[in-house]
Amino acid sequence: MEKPLPNPPIQESLRKQSPQDAVYDDLVFGLKRYEAAFSIKDSIEDVLANFSKDEEKEMVCLSTSIAENPYQSLSLESVPSKILFGSFLFYVKDRIPEKAGYIIEEQFCKRLQQIDYDAYSFSPKECNEKLKNIFSEFSQMKLKMLSVFFSIVQILLPKLSGDYQEHVQFFASISAVVAPRGYVFEIYHAVEHLSLEAREVFQLHHPPSPKQTRRVVSEGPLNGVNYKQNTTNNRVSSFQNSQYSTLNNFQNNSNQSPNSNDLQPLQAEAFHSAHNGYSSSTLNLNSELNVMKDHDLQAPIPRALKQHKLPPIPVPEVQTTNIGYQTDLPLQNPNDNLVSLAIYEALYEKFLKACKDLEEVSKSYEESREEIEALHETFTEEVTSFQSTKRLKEEKIIQEKSRVDKMIDEYRQKLSEST
């Protein structure tokens, strides 16, 4: 069953509203329909993969249906996660701007862009207060719409698989729909911060909180989380085959009405720009992954390079054996050195078992090595982060001491002049 929805506004209250307020109420109720539907989904895996034209039509049709009549008796419980998520993106990107403009308007995009979110990585409360001050200037209905939007994001975040690339692409996707097209890259960090701090900024009360997601995305594997190379390769392969890997050039025209066909290029552009800072017509994924290794958008401190590499281990290969090879030896009596077939088969079985055990030990060693390397990388990052924080605090203390010494000297000088 879907999460319970609030009762639709009664006709008497609708008559007291202005037409625009009634439109806002409908749009907010439509968002709450998505919120209720996502809350019962176990996961949203593969929703960021490419989708066919038929699936796109289904997404657009569903978003239009909800926008036109959000109070209809349409259950979203049975809608596949992929279609539901795509419909949600189209609803926010196309349906809401058609009726009420973008949720985050251009003037507020510029103000959100001016905040240095990396500077508040260790003290998000101060940043949250700045965001609250900006949102206090929103209209009541736009603020409610934004609150429900990030409430949905809070529900979706813990249901991602946890892969770094998937989180970046997810943040890029929602950045591409919540604001005008020309500000997709500019507000990426703002959207990421709001997605992680939404409960504090908008005073949301429902679980879960994705604070652990912040550490996974920003700082790398922790607490035994092990991102293995084969998992990355599988995701790279699926990403290379997706429609997001082909970017379409487009003009940033704020007056142009949104088009449902440009959702995928928007997501890809945001994903591409979020890592490199520039737009390109073709996305080279291998280059992207190299950039990810050297520059982490979410981490406040650059990743430290590891200073050691464990040597690779050989994996034994079991080859077939010629049972009759002893007869080829230049012996006067070959039968003196032959063993019975039963003994040979028993020894050969032991050999195969030993090879299998060695392969298992090698595999276990490989996994342990990856775990150690991940822990070493995490430890190095933590040390670098601590040293940076310590250096900043020491500089602040020195500046404060200089300021106090200066005040003391000025006070002494005034005393001497007065006497």
From Swiss-Prot:
GO cellular component terms, A-Z: cell division site; medial cortical node; mitotic actomyosin contractile ring; mitotic actomyosin contractile ring, intermediate layer
GO BP term, pick one: mitotic cytokinesis, division site positioning
Domain of life: Eukaryota
Listed InterPro entries: Gef2/Nod1_dom
Pfam families reported in the protein's UniProt record: Nod1
Name under which the protein is recorded: Uncharacterized protein C12B10.10
Natural source organism: Schizosaccharomyces pombe (strain 972 / ATCC 24843) (Fission yeast)
